[in-house]
Amino acid sequence: MIIIDGGWAENAPALRKVIAQNGNHVDAWFISHTHSDHVGAFNVIYADPQGVTIDRIYDNGYDYEFIKEAGEPYDSMGLEPLETFHNLTKDADNIIHLRRDEELEVCGLRIHVYNAFDDIVKQNVGPDLDYQNDGSLCMKITNQEESFLYTGDVKADMNKYLFETYGDELTGDYVQLSHHGNWGFGTEDYDRMNAKAYFADITPEFYESHPIGELHQHLVDEGKQYYDYGTAPNSVELK
């Protein structure tokens, strides 16, 4: 069983049920970045496992001291869960800090890391100094024939570097929209990817007030398969 992020702290009970259905064992748990909507449930479960075992934890190689000093535009969404995650895992012997361009194999799947927290993020961050989102994991997960591009919460600050550096590698048969479909990769980027389906980790109620509304309509108009929390539970088989 592989988990990527896991949601808010209040999502922990539901996530525990899913883990229990898989023998209370997690082979690999990826934390894209330490904002509360991504790491909250992990923090709760790791602090009180209740029988849950985790073989490996992979994070984005965040710089704890740097982020604490630089600050966080999302206040309690960023610094408090960062502090909790750091204190929980700093002495763990099963945590791996991923780096840009790293390649690994997990549960028979090939994973290529295109974005992680490093000096390149620091050089490209925008005026909001949103280091945690911009330093979020972006990685392609590939099985025998198909791939899934997970983009985390990477925002538009990183678009120029990522697409100039990796170009057509940044695609997949299935694609998760970056930063919940808001202020991340552009419409033209998703068109170029031409994925079979797009996943948005957001509820439809945000479509009228956030940029995701326009992106959602565009993808639907283009005839793309589109999933969000409103269509959950969502699943695909990665061949």
Regions flagged by a language model, labelled:
Residues 29, 146-148, 224:
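Generic detector of bulky aromatic hydrophobic side chains
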Residues 2, 7-59, 165-182, 194-198:
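Active-site metal-binding motif and surrounding structural segment of the metallo-beta-lactamase
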Residues 1-24, 90, 94-171, 236-239:
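Core dinuclear metal-dependent hydrolase active-site scaffold
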Residues 9-11, 34-40, 63-67, 102, ...:
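Active-site environment of divalent metal-dependent phosphoester hydrolases
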Residues 56-58, 62-118, 129-133, 197-239:
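Binuclear metal-ion centers of metallo-dependent hydrolases, dominated by the metallo-beta-lactamase
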Residues 11-15, 38-41, 77-85, 150, ...:
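Stable alpha-helical elements in mature extracytoplasmic
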Residues 15-16, 42-44, 71, 162-164, ...:
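Short amphipathic alpha-helical segments
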Residues 18, 28, 38, 58, ...:
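Broad hydrophobic/π-residue packing in well-ordered secondary structure
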